Amino acid sequence: MRWRSLSGHRFFVKSTTMRKHTAVEVAAALVFRNEKLLIARRPSGVHLAGLWEFPGGKREQGESFESCLQREIWEELDCGITVGSLVFKNVHSYSEKTVDIRFYHCKLTQGEPRAIECDALEWITKDQVADYSFPEADVALLEYLDRCPHLWV
């Protein structure tokens, strides 16, 4: 490991050798209702199977994050949403890939969410978050949500 200075600045950036990863851009929905947040359990046979996450998916080439999210929610949950503001962004590297994930505040506009491409759906309160296991890429968001009670209303 080396430390290198950034010219003109008084701080240092840790420089390490990293493996080249496949970069994946993901949009995820934060859907709140009655002080509860919608989460989905990842199906078996996929990366991070069995962990809980926020509904959404991979962005296709030429697609906006907002359009991606609307498409993914229709495909995975059979319901419509309005995509609101960007709440949080995180870039996380796993051993096999790097995930650039953007979390948007969303509202249900059509239908009731159904578990089409996930094992299960749950509406959880802020106090129940610790009872579920989430991917590492979601941990920073969960810490942020813990500090933002106004989002749960």
Predicted region positions:
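The catalytic Nudix box helix
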Residues: 54-86, 125
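Active-site-adjacent beta-strand/loop module that shapes the phosphate/pyrophosphate-binding cleft
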Residues: 80, 89-112, 122, 145
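NUDIX/MutT-family hydrolases
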Residues: 105, 114-145
